[in-house]
A protein has these predicted regions:
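Acidic, polar ligand-binding/catalytic clefts
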Residues: 35, 39, 43-44, 50-109, ...
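Extracytoplasmic/periplasmic, Sec-exported soluble proteins
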Residues: 26-33, 52, 56, 92, ...
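Extracytoplasmic small-molecule ligand-binding "clamshell" domains
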Residues: 1-80, 121-122, 128-133, 141
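Alpha-helical transmembrane signal-anchor helices
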Residues: 225-273
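Extended ligand-binding regions for polar small-molecule ligands
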Residues: 1, 32-44, 106-120, 124, ...
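Conserved HAMP-HisKA connector
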Residues: 278-283
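Sec-exported extracytoplasmic/periplasmic mature domains
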Residues: 42-47, 65, 69, 144-148, ...
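Membrane-proximal low-complexity regions enriched in glycine and acidic/polar residues
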Residues: 91-104, 108-177, 183
Length: 283
């Protein structure tokens, strides 16, 4: 792979922010599943990466018009839109399920919010109005403010921002609807890059993929615990009591086992001593 990409040195990667757990910024640094995969890919191929972040798809088009980028990640593109922008999608990193997000206090179903770029994946025929937003977080906020009755998009992304916002929205799967999460590679970049990248993606095991996704979700993992505590204080207190009891039991069992071992050893020693004294008397 290093020899194949010998003509390349630095890859310029355009990242669309607010697409956690796949692509986002954490404390000003690139983060997310796709970032982690590209970092490891660059390390293996001895390439350098230069990440540039933009806010949404609209701004991404401006960046692509005014600059040159080898890759584009975040807010996955369908093959048609990808080709229109002069890119080719890599092999799917993962296939993510699509879902609805709904406010449990809302009884309406006339307006649906959808992220720009995936409209063709969502059947909106049964709704009176369709609102198009630049990112998933804006779709969620539209449902929270009741501008929309529900939103549709990538389940992992929506659940990340539901946790992140401390929201009470609920998700439900859209049966049979999925989207590929891929890395878009520019047609102007050396064609061998796409082939080598695809080979690398195919080589990633299911366990490693789960690890990459987990790294992308680190922010929401701690928040989900906070969210559970906030929403269910009584259960949280009970859970804490149970955990403390389990820890006490775990600490007690080894100590109790060690004490029993000491008693057994002492009894064995006493038995051996009695036998030795008995032998001495008989002699």
């Amino acid at each position: 792979q290093q020899q194949t990409l010998a003509g390349l040195d630095t890859l310029n990667v355009l990242c669309i922010d607010n697409d956690a757990p796949y692509v986002y910024q954490k404390d000003g640094e690139p983060a997310g599943m796709l970032i982690a995969i590209l970092d490891d890919f660059a390390e293996r191929t001895e390439l350098n990466l230069s990440y540039t972040f933009c806010e949404d798809r609209t701004q991404a088009r401006e960046y692509l018009t005014n600059g040159s980028y080898d890759m584009r990640i975040g807010a996955p593109l369908t093959s048609g839109t990808c080709a229109e922008l002069g890119f080719i999608n890599s092999a799917p990193v993962i296939q993510s399920v699509l879902a609805y997000v709904q406010n449990p206090t809302s009884s309406g179903s006339g307006t649906i919010a959808v992220m720009s770029g995936i409209e063709e994946l969502i059947n909106t025929e049964g709704y009176d109005n369709t609102l198009i937003f630049d990112n998933t977080n804006e779709c969620i906020q539209a449902v929270e403010s009741k501008k929309a009755d529900l939103a549709a998009g990538d389940r992992s992304v929506m659940e990340y921002y539901i946790y992140d916002n401390g929201s009470t929205l609920v998700t439900s799967l859209i049966p049979g609807q999925t989207q590929n999460v891929s890395i878009a590679v520019s047609r102007e970049t050396d064609a061998t890059l796409l082939a080598v990248l695809n080979n690398y993606i195919y080589s990633i095991s299911e366990a490693d993929l789960a690890g990459y996704l987990s790294r992308g979700n680190l922010h929401s993992d701690s928040f989900s615990l906070l969210l559970f505590t906030r929403r269910h204080p009584a259960q949280a207190i009970l859970s804490k009591i149970v955990v403390m009891a389990v820890l006490a039991l775990v600490n007690f069992l080894p100590a109790n086992r060690a004490a029993k071992q000491r008693v057994a050893m002492q009894e064995q020693h006493n038995t051996q001593l009695k036998e030795a004294l008995q032998i001495a008397r008989e002699a």
